[in-house]
Amino acid sequence: MADSVLAAVRVAPSTTELRELPMPELSDDAALLKVEVAGICGTDVKMYAKPPFGDPVIMGHENVGTIAVAGKKFKQLHGVAEGDRVFVEHYVGCYNCEWCRIGEYRHCEATDWRTNTDARRYGYTSSENPGTLWGGFSEYIYLPWNAVLHKVPDGVTAELAGLVTPLSNGIEWALLAAGVGYADTVLIEGPGQQGLSQVVACKQAGASKIIVSGTTRDKARLDLALELGADDVIDVEQANPCETVMDLTAGRGVDFVLDCTSRAGVGPVLLGIDALKRREGTLLIQGELAAFPDFPIKLLTEKAITIKSARGHSYRACELALEQLSSGRFPLERLSTHRFGLDQVDHAIRALAGDTADKNVIHISLMPWLGKEK
């Protein structure tokens, strides 16, 4: 194996550079993953433009690859061997707290970079920390003993497995957090990666009517929502969304509103409150809304609306996402729209942000070895 690794390192806002980094030394309880796919999502767009800190970082938190080399203890602990394909959660938990013990690594303080300056999380941790390779925009990533792995089922390609993060979020947020189930009616606001993943989750859970809203520029995504199981779609720039929801539900409104818009302000939340049924609907807020002046609390209480929030995913949701991919029930390969190599990281992130000429971008696969191997 080579002595160095090629990685795209974020060195400033909206700037990465390719660097040759030393291959980390491995203890008996560590391993190296050869990265096949690192998915790119909206979080990458945000962290690329406005890094939370100035240290050099190898971004990439949706990582799939094969075990290149592993110590004996690592193999025993995780039940893996060289050559196994795995999906790696971006959380690197302590494995000792109450959250880690139930597979909720997202809540572990050891992986929360917001409150812990020494946190470990793929795509966020500085490359100056021990292990160096803490992100998927690299030929290899470092796996400590407490990395969280999921074996990828036979028949699921690396590119398809690169969808585990958005799909697991869809399962976690729509089903496990909001509680969508059999015969429920749902409005999903925003047909991006997360919204489309929630279409699939709600369909599989038995929802009786799934409505997806978006803007005129989302036409290709709204069309895909119908292919994935949505019953109706609404272009909010061409029709009154609340009136349309009421028409589609015979005036009743929906049981659940799942707001997965980004940078859309308070409008989707207000629409959600209006579109919910007369009593005891549920609104799940998943976006980055920082404040809400004059929040309509009176209407909220009059309609007995339950508001929930969602962030990240559990171990169980990732396993369910892999089962979903393995089943072949839905054309999930349609979510993965673009491929880029390691030397195209800046372009790839900008493409997802809508700042390039690339069309109909949904989920991007960053492939470090693209064009390098036969």
For each of these PLM feature ranges, what is it?
Residues 1-69, 135, 139-143, 365-374:
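Short N-terminal strand-loop motif that marks the start
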Residues 2-7, 224, 239-240, 247, ...:
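C-terminal hydrophobic helical "lid"/dimerization subdomain
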Residues 24-38, 51-101, 105-106, 153-155:
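Glycine-rich beta-strand-centered segment in the early N-terminal region that forms part
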Residues 41, 89-150:
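Cysteine-cluster motifs in flexible loop/terminal segments that predominantly coordinate metals
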Residues 83, 139, 148, 153-239, ...:
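Mid-domain Rossmann-like dinucleotide-binding core that forms the NAD(H)/NADP(H) cofactor-binding site
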Residues 86, 186, 255-257:
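Receiver (REC) domain switch-region micro-motif
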Residues 177-182, 204-205, 211, 219-223, ...:
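Glycine-rich cofactor phosphate-binding loops and adjacent beta1-alpha1 units
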Residues 282-284, 295-334:
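Rossmann-fold dehydrogenase core element
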